Amino acid sequence: MKYKIEKNTVQETLILPLYSRKLCTELYPNLYRDETAVRLLDQIDYDFSGAEKSSRSLMQRFGALEVAMRQNDLVFEVQAYLKTHPCAAVVNLGCGLDNTGRACDNGSCKIYNLDFPDVSTVRNELLPAGEREKNIPCDQSDAASFAKIDASGGAVFFASGVFYYFLTEQVKALVQTMADAFPGCMLVFDAAIRTAVKMIAK
């Protein structure tokens, strides 16, 4: 039985990045592969007609390529951190149905996937936590969620396509909270110019 996702819900925000990763896997397999995205989309009951129609456009194809390069960059940075902190916490902020934590897994790190409760509900159903992995439902601006993270071996946080939806002051506050809670931790994220952010956040 497929998991149904309704239009105009928080859960619907999972669809576009997941579809973009699937599209890039199909279009540019030599650059990027996300078999999890391909598998998960087959398990979701949703009207994909709009996404499928736009996938033929040059803009959407470029967007899919951008998503792939972003994910590759994030994995590179996280894996580089794990070389010197092999038992670190790998924290995916605004995880959605993204499997990057597992893509970075070195066999000894701990993986934490943080997102809103509605999103975590879908993730627990379609992408349940594996060994050394936890899905944590939370508001990312709430520092209380950080208490559930074991950073005794270090911590590397990454946010993929997340901060576009935050105000500048919210990002500053979150980064300060993380710095206070996890001294010496690393944060990896993507950014864009103001015009691009407005287009992305529509």
Can you describe what each PLM-predicted range is?
Residues 114, 159-160, 189:
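Active-site flanking residues adjacent to catalytic metal/cofactor-binding acidic residues
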Residues 155-160, 171:
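A short beta-strand submotif of the Rossmann-like class I SAM-dependent methyltransferase core
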